[in-house]
Amino acid sequence: MTGHCLCGAITYRVDVEPMITANCHCRDCQRQTGTAFSVLVAVPRASLHIDGDIATHTTVGTDTHLNVRRQFCSNCGSPIVSLPDMTPDLAFIKAGTLDDTTMLVPEMDVWCDSAMTWVAMDDEARGQWARGVPLEF
């Protein structure tokens, strides 16, 4: 998989297939993306190779109270990846930055307790976690 930011200053590649794709409804993802949820693609951190001047903003997760490093393009501000301390071996790529999204189908919704009330979730199609993320996929 490959991807890039809006201006093209950041490019990345991943050497493996995604482990899982999820819609994250936590308040921090809502604030970072400026929308109802973030579509995240989980990959092993060691498989993610980023080129360009990536900036990092570290916050304490509102729900987890653990650090989350959010990396973004220092030029255009596009969010690229989240690196939560809660899952130290995983990187969560922002799906909108992928060059090819045709293979993506979200398999779960996480932090559903924080979902905006108007977001429709299909109980039958995906797993749902009210609070948190399953640590084993």
What residues fall within each predicted segment?
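A short Gly-Trp-Pro
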Residues: 1-137
